[in-house]
C-alpha cells in the first residue's frame, strides 16, 4: 500500500481544496441533477421483474373438460410449444373454458412474445371446433397477479344485464386503452342476450326437434352483404329486414306449419331478454354487481397505470345514468404509496439520527454541518443516475438509500476526524486539510472499492431474484461512489474554511462531559486491548469459535424466500363438494360473505361464482377481501385470515382458503394458498393413482398446513352410451345426437344480433324446470330417416359416472398442483425439506415427476445460490483488497472480521423470530462490506506507523487501535442508526424492511465489540507468519 508521506500536499483532494468555487459549483451540479432526476422517477412497490406472461382464453359453452382438453387446449398447446423463448406453459381445461398461460424467458420482450402467440393461434385455427362461438383471445397479463384495481358497478333501478352492457361499452373499453392495462374483466357474466327456452313436450307434440328450431332461428336472423345497384346516374345500396333485434321479434318467428297453421317460436318456447350465461354471478358486499377487475401488463408501472385510470373515471361515470353507481372497492396503489411514504420517513429519520451521532462525537456545529451536507448531497445525486438507468422509487431502492445513510457519512467522518486531529495539534486549517486529506485519501478509496466489491455478486444473480436486487445493489453502489467523491472534494474544502482551533477547542459543559466519557472509554479499551494482546491464543480461540458458531447458526436458522407482506387485500377460494351446482354455490357464498363482513377488520368483499377464464369449476368461488387501512385495524393480515377461517369453519360443506396478496408475484396461476408443488405424469390414470397417496402423506406433515390439490375427478357425469347400429338403422348420426344434447343443455349460442355499438347472442336451451336432473334427457327427440322423431332412449342408454371437473397440463402433460401454507413455528425451508423426504419415502416411479412452482421454486434456486453468493462477495473483496494493498496477507486479516458479523446477524434474526430470507441475506452481504472497515482503518495506520516511524508491529497496531477507536465507533454507530429505523418499522410494508434492519443492527453490535480485539491479534499472527515464511524461503519476497 502506498501511503502519502508527512507533509503531503493533499493528493487527489488538493485541487478541490484550493479551488472552493469550482468545488461548490460541481457539488451544486450534482445536487441539481439529482433534484431534476427525482421529479422524473416513477413510484413502484418493487423493481419491475415480471416474467413476460400471456394468457390465452377460449370459451366453448357446454363443452365438457375432456372435450375442451382434446378439441381446444391440445391443438393450441401443440402450436405454443414450438415458440422460442417459452419458459413454461400451463393450461386448465374445465367445463366450457380453456385457459393457457404462457410464461416466457425474462430476456424476451413482451411484444415479441405477443407476436409469436398470435402466429401460433392463427396456425391452430383450422384444428379448433367449427362451432366455436369466438376465437381464442389472448391478454398480456399474468392471471396470478392480483388486480391493481377492483370496481363494483351496481344499480337499484336497472337489470344487471343492461348495466353490464353500458359499462362494457362506455367504461371497460376505455380503461382497456390505458397504457399499462393488460386486461379488464367484468366478473358476473351478465351480458345481455335473447334466451330461448324450449318446452320439450310442446316441441315433441308438434313432431319437431330442437335442431329444427335452431335451424329456423339461424336462418331467420342474418346480417350479410347484399350488394348495390349502379345505374347511369345513381348508385343504390341494397338493404333488408334480415335481422331480428328483440325477444318479441323472435317470439313471433314462424318455425314450422302444422295443418296449414303457422307455429311460432313463442308457441313452443319461452323467449325473454336475459343473460348470456345464467350460471355466472358476482356480488359486492352481498349485493348483485358487475365487478370490474383491472390487471396490468407484466412490466407496467402500477402507480402510473392506476393514476391514469383514476383521472379518467369521473369522465367515464358521467356518461352513465344516475342510478348506476361505480365504486372503487380496492386499489393496490394505496398501500404501495403508504409503504413508500413510510420508507421515505425512515430514510429522513436515519439521516437525522446519523447527524445526531456526528454531533455527539464532534460536539461542534461547523464540524457537524460538513457531513450533514455530504449525506443528503450523496443521496440526492444518486437520483440522477437512477433516472438514467430507468430505475424507480420503490421499497428496495429506498431501503438502499436508507442503508447508504450510514455508509456515506463514514467517508466524511474519517476525513473530518483526521483533519481535526491536525488542527488540534496546531496546524493551520488549510495545511491541516491538505495534509489530513492526503493522508486519508487511500483509506477512503480502500473503503469505497472494497464495499462496492461486496455488491458485485448481487449484479450477477440470475433469474427473477437477480433482477429484483439489481436496482438495490446499483443504487447503493452509486450512493457510495458519490459519497467518496464528495468526501475527497467538498468535505476537505469545507474543513479548510469552516474548522479552526478556536471552534474545535470551544467547549461547554456538555462537551467536556462527553470528552471525559470518551477518554474513559478509550482508556478502558486500551487496558483491555493490552490484556488481549498478551493472551493471543485465547483471543484466536474466540475468533475460531465465532466462525464455528456462525456455521452452526446458518444450519439451524429457519429459512424463507420473501417476507409475507400485509397489503390489505386477501384473495380467497371457496371450495364445495364436486357435485355442487351453481345455485348451491351461490347460496354458500352468501353464507360465507355474511360471516366475513361481520369481521371488524374487513372493509369490503367481492365474490364470484361460475366458470370463466378466472374460475375453473362450478364448485368453487373466488373472493377478494379488502381490509381497512393498517392504522384503522388492530390486527395484521395473518391474524385476520385465521379469524375469518375460524368463523367460516362452522358452515357445512365448504372449505375456505385465504392468502394475502403480494407485490412480488412469481406464480402463473391463482392458487388456494401461498406455495405450490406439482405432480406430473404421462397419463391421467397414473395421476389418479398417485395423487391421493401423496396428498395423504403431505397432509400428515406438521411442517405443512391447509394442504389441498386441484385434482377433482369425482364430478357427476351422465354418460350417453349410443347403440351405433340402432342409430344407423334409423338414419341418426352421432353428430345428430351431439347437436340435440348441445341444443338442450349447453346454453348454445346459435345466432348473433348486431347493433351499431355491440353484438348480442341468442341462447338456445331446454326449459328444465319441470324435468330436473337426468329425467330431462328423456325429453330429447331426434329426427329419423323417414322424417319422424324418436326419443333418445330408443338408441341410447344413460349411465351415471364420475368425471374430472377440470384437466390441467404443464408443458402439455397432465399435472396436478398441491397447494400448502407453512404453519407458525416452521419455515418454508422446513416445508420444502419435508416434501422432498416424503417423495423419497413414497418411491415414486420414473414416469411421475414432481416440481416446486412459483415462489417455492424461486426459494429453492435462491437457497442453492446463497452460499456461493456470499463466497463470491468474500472473494471479490479479497481480490480488491489484495490489489489495493499489494499483499496476500493483509486482506485475510481484514476478512477475518466477517464471522462476527454473521453471528450477530443470525442471532438477531433468531431472537426476533425472523426467517433467513433473501432480504436478510442481502443484509448479511452488506455487513461483509461494513465490518471490514474497522480492520481497514486499523491496518492502514499500523502499516504507516511501521514504515514511517519504525514502530514494532505490536506497538503500531496498538497505537492504531487507540487512534482510530473514535472514528471506528462513530462510523459503526452511524451505520447502526441508519439501519435502526428499518428494524423498528411498523407501518405498511414493514415486513419487507424489518429483516434487513434486524440483520444489520445485530451484526454491527456483535462485530463492533469483537473486531476491536480480534483484528489486532490476527494482524500480529499474520505478521509473524510472514516473517516465518521469509526466514524459511529467503529468496521469496513478499511485500506484506
Curated annotation (Swiss-Prot):
Domain of life: Bacteria
GO MF entries: xenobiotic transmembrane transporter activity
Membrane topology reported for the UniProt record: Multi-pass membrane protein
GO cellular component: plasma membrane
Record flagged with keyword Glycoprotein: no
InterPro entries: AcrB_DN_DC_subdom, Acrflvin-R, Multidrug-R_MdtB
UniProt keyword list: Cell inner membrane, Cell membrane, Membrane, Transmembrane, Transmembrane helix, Transport
Subcellular location: Cell inner membrane
Regions crossing the membrane: 25-45, 347-367, 369-389, 396-416, 440-460, 472-492, 537-557, 863-883, 888-908, 910-930, 968-988, 998-1018
Pfam family, one: ACR_tran
Family: Belongs to the resistance-nodulation-cell division (RND) (TC 2.A.6) family. MdtB subfamily.
PANTHER family with a match to the protein in the record: MULTIDRUG RESISTANCE PROTEIN MDTB (PTHR32063:SF21), PTHR32063
HAMAP family listed in its UniProt record: MdtB
Subunit structure, interactors included: Part of a tripartite efflux system composed of MdtA, MdtB and MdtC. MdtB forms a heteromultimer with MdtC.
Protein's name according to its UniProt entry: Multidrug resistance protein MdtB
Species in which this protein is naturally found: Salmonella schwarzengrund (strain CVM19633)
Organism placement in taxonomy: Bacteria, Pseudomonadati, Pseudomonadota, Gammaproteobacteria, Enterobacterales
Gene (UniProt): mdtB
Amino acid at each position: 500500500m502506498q501511503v502519502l508521506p508527512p507533509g503531503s500536499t493533499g493528493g487527489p483532494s488538493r485541487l478541490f481544496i484550493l479551488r472552493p468555487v469550482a468545488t461548490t459549483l460541481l457539488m451544486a451540479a450534482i445536487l441539481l441533477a439529482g433534484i431534476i432526476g427525482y421529479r422524473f422517477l416513477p413510484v413502484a412497490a418493487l423493481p419491475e421483474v415480471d416474467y413476460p406472461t400471456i394468457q390465452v382464453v377460449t370459451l366453448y359453452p357446454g363443452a365438457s373438460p375432456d372435450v375442451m382438453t382434446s378439441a381446444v387446449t391440445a391443438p393450441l398447446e401443440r402450436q405454443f410449444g414450438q415458440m422460442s423463448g417459452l419458459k413454461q406453459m400451463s393450461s386448465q381445461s374445465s367445463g366450457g373454458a380453456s385457459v393457457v398461460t404462457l410464461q416466457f424467458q425474462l430476456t424476451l420482450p413482451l411484444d415479441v412474445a405477443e407476436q409469436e402467440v398470435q402466429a401460433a393461434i392463427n396456425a391452430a385455427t383450422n384444428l379448433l371446433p367449427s362451432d366455436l362461438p369466438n376465437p381464442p383471445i389472448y391478454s398480456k397479463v399474468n392471471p396470478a397477479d392480483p388486480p391493481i384495481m377492483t370496481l363494483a358497478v351496481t344499480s337499484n333501478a336497472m337489470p344487471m344485464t343492461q348495466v353490464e352492457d353500458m359499462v362494457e361499452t362506455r367504461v371497460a373499453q376505455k380503461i382497456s386503452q390505458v397504457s399499462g392495462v393488460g386486461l379488464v374483466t367484468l366478473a358476473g357474466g351478465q351480458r345481455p342476450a335473447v334466451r330461448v327456452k324450449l318446452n320439450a313436450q310442446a316441441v315433441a307434440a308438434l313432431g319437431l326437434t330442437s335442431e329444427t328450431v335452431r335451424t329456423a332461428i339461424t336462418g331467420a336472423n342474418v346480417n350479410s352483404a347484399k350488394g348495390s345497384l349502379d345505374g347511369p346516374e345513381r348508385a343504390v345500396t341494397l338493404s333488408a329486414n334480415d335481422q331480428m333485434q328483440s325477444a318479441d321479434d323472435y317470439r313471433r318467428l314462424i318455425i314450422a306449419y302444422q295443418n296449414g297453421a303457422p307455429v311460432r317460436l313463442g308457441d313452443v318456447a319461452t323467449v325473454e331478454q336475459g343473460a348470456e350465461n345464467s350460471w355466472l354471478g358476482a356480488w359486492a358486499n352481498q349485493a348483485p354487481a358487475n365487478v370490474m377487475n383491472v390487471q396490468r401488463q407484466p412490466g407496467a408501472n402500477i402507480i402510473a397505470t392506476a393514476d391514469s385510470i383514476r383521472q379518467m373515471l369521473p369522465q367515464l361515470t358521467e356518461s352513465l345514468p344516475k342510478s348506476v353507481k361505480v365504486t372503487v372497492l380496492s386499489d393496490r396503489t394505496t398501500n404501495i404509496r403508504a409503504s413508500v411514504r413510510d420508507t421515505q420517513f425512515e430514510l429522513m429519520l436515519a439521516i437525522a439520527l446519523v447527524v445526531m451521532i456526528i454531533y455527539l462525537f464532534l460536539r461542534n456545529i461547523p464540524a457537524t454541518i460538513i457531513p450533514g451536507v455530504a449525506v443528503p448531497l450523496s443521496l440526492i445525486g444518486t437520483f440522477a443516475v437512477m433516472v438514467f438507468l430507468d430505475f424507480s422509487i420503490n421499497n428496495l431502492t429506498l431501503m438502499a438509500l436508507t442503508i447508504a445513510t450510514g455508509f456515506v457519512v463514514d467517508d466524511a467522518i474519517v476525513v473530518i476526524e483526521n483533519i481535526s486531529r491536525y488542527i488540534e495539534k496546531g496546524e493551520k486549517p488549510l495545511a491541516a486539510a491538505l495534509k489530513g486529506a492526503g493522508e486519508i485519501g487511500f483509506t477512503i478509496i480502500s473503503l469505497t472499492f472494497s464495499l462496492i466489491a461486496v455488491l458485485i455478486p448481487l449484479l450477477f444473480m440470475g433469474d427473477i431474484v437477480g433482477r429484483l436486487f439489481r436496482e438495490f445493489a446499483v443504487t447503493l453502489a452509486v450512493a457510495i461512489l458519490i459519497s467518496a467523491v464528495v468526501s475527497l472534494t467538498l468535505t476537505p474544502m469545507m474543513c479548510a474554511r469552516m474548522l479552526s482551533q478556536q471552534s474545535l477547542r470551544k467547549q461547554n459543559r456538555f462537551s467536556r462531559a462527553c470528552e471525559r466519557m470518551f477518554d474513559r472509554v478509550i482508556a478502558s479499551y486500551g487496558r483491555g486491548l493490552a490484556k488481549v494482546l498478551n493472551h493471543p491464543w485465547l483471543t484466536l480461540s474466540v475468533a475460531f469459535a465465532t466462525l464455528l458458531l456462525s456455521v452452526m447458526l446458518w444450519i439451524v436458522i429457519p429459512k424463507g424466500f420473501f417476507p409475507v407482506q400485509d397489503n390489505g387485500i386477501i384473495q380467497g377460494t371457496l371450495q364445495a363438494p364436486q357435485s355442487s351446482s351453481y345455485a348451491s354455490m351461490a347460496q354458500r357464498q352468501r353464507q360465507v360473505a355474511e360471516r366475513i363482513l361481520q369481521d371488524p377488520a374487513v372493509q369490503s368483499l367481492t365474490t364470484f361464482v361460475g366458470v370463466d377464464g378466472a374460475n375453473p369449476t362450478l364448485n368453487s368461488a373466488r373472493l377478494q377481501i379488502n381490509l381497512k387501512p393498517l392504522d384503522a385495524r388492530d390486527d395484521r393480515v395473518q391474524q385476520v385470515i385465521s379469524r375469518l377461517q375460524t368463523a367460516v369453519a362452522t358452515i357445512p360443506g365448504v372449505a375456505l382458503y385465504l392468502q394475502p396478496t403480494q407485490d412480488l408475484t412469481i406464480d402463473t396461476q391463482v392458487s388456494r394458498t401461498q406455495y405450490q408443488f406439482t405432480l406430473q405424469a404421462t397419463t391421467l390414470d397414473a395421476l389418479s393413482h398417485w395423487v391421493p397417496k401423496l396428498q395423504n402423506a403431505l397432509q400428515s406433515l406438521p411442517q405443512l398446513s391447509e394442504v389441498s390439490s386441484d385434482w377433482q375427478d369425482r364430478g357427476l357425469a351422465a354418460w350417453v352410451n349410443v347403440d351405433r347400429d340402432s342409430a344407423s338403422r334409423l338414419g341418426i348420426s352421432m353428430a345428430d345426437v351431439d347437436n340435440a344434447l348441445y341444443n338442450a343443455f349447453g346454453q348454445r349460442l346459435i345466432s348473433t344480433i348486431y347493433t351499431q355499438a355491440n353484438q348480442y347472442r341468442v341462447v338456445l336451451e331446454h326449459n328444465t324446470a319441470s324435468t330436473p336432473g337426468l329425467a330431462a334427457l328423456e325429453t330429447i327427440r331426434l329426427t329419423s330417416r323417414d322424417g319422424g322423431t324418436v326419443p333418445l332412449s330408443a338408441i341410447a342408454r344413460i349411465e351415471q359416472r364420475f368425471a374430472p371437473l377440470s384437466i390441467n397440463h404443464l408443458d402439455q402433460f397432465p399435472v396436478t398442483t398441491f397447494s400448502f401454507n407453512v404453519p407458525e413455528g416452521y419455515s418454508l425451508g422446513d416445508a420444502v425439506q419435508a416434501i422432498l423426504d416424503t417423495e423419497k419415502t413414497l418411491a415414486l416411479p420414473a414416469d411421475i415427476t414432481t416440481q416446486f412452482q412459483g415462489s417455492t421454486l424461486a426459494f429453492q434456486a435462491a437457497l442453492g445460490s446463497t452460499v456461493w453468493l456470499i463466497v463470491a462477495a468474500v472473494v471479490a473483496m479479497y481480490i480488491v483488497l489484495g490489489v489495493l494493498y499489494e499483499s496476500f496477507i493483509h486482506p485475510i486479516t481484514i476478512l477475518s472480521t466477517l464471522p462476527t458479523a454473521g453471528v450477530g446477524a443470525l442471532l438477531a434474526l433468531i431472537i426476533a423470530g425472523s426467517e433467513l430470507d433473501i432480504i436478510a441475506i442481502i443484509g448479511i452481504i452488506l455487513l461483509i462490506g461494513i465490518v471490514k472497515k474497522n480492520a481497514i482503518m486499523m491496518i492502514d495506520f499500523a502499516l504507516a506507523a511501521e514504515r514511517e516511524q519504525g514502530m514494532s508491529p505490536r506497538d503500531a497496531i496498538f497505537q492504531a487501535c487507540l487512534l482510530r477507536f473514535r472514528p471506528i465507533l462513530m462510523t459503526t454507530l452511524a451505520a447502526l442508526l441508519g439501519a435502526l429505523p428499518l428494524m423498528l418499522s411498523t407501518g405498511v410494508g414493514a415486513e419487507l424492511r424489518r429483516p434487513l434492519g434486524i440483520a444489520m443492527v445485530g451484526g454491527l453490535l456483535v462485530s463492533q465489540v469483537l473486531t476491536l480485539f480480534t483484528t489486532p491479534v490476527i494482524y500480529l499472527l499474520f505478521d509473524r507468519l510472514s516473517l516465518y515464511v521469509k526466514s524459511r524461503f529467503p529468496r521469496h519476497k513478499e511485500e506484506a
